[in-house]
Amino acid sequence: MSAKGGTIKDKWKMKKWYSIIAPKVFGEVSLGSTPAYDVTQTIGRRVETTLYDLTGDFSQVYVHLYFKIVSNEGDRLITRFVGHELSRDYLRSLIRRKSSKVNSVFDVTTKDGYVVRVKGLVLTTYKCHQSQKTAIRKIINETISKKASELTFDDFTQEVVFGRLANEIFEATKKIYPLRKAEIEKTKVLKVPENLGKQVESSSVSSG
């Protein structure tokens, strides 16, 4: 029994700790650390945190951020932002009886070639007609698509996670019907530029 326990401890001691670093768009702050026998074992791992953990602003605790470890620089694990999602509890808190919810899910391409699936959400103050929902959904799509085409992926990411794009949608759609809230409920990166993928493959070979 003790021999087995000793073996487990010995294996744990053989592991090395690596620091997980956020992308430049999030200030390259620490996302924590992870152990591994070899740095190549960490590549591809998914990391979850909240915007609150990065900014210290408790009002952003419901914004969940997802990153993927794509390469390393010595003991530092470099990540890429791969999406975000608002917490279910927060979304439930927005729902009201006798109001309408307008969702729109579609793919956009940023100025620098990232393909991102975006889920927009608008909540009206009262129940609205189907024609009004259609008009609201059209504006959601147009606003997000235009913003994505004009911005790099990093800039688009900031517009999304810090709520600025949602505010723009709110201002544009409130002209159709009284609104309570607009949000970018979820994003997911579907494709990165081909040249970036090749750079990642090259840099992840070295363990420093």
Swiss-Prot record:
GO terms for molecular function: structural constituent of ribosome. Keywords: Ribonucleoprotein, Ribosomal protein. GO terms for cellular component: ribonucleoprotein complex; ribosome. InterPro entries: Ribosomal_eS1, Ribosomal_eS1_arc. One of its GO terms (biological process) is translation. It comes from the Archaea. SMART domains: Ribosomal_S3Ae (SM01397). PANTHER family: 40S RIBOSOMAL PROTEIN S3A. Belongs to the eukaryotic ribosomal protein eS1 family. This is Small ribosomal subunit protein eS1. The lineage of its organism: Archaea, Thermoproteota, Thermoprotei, Sulfolobales, Sulfolobaceae.
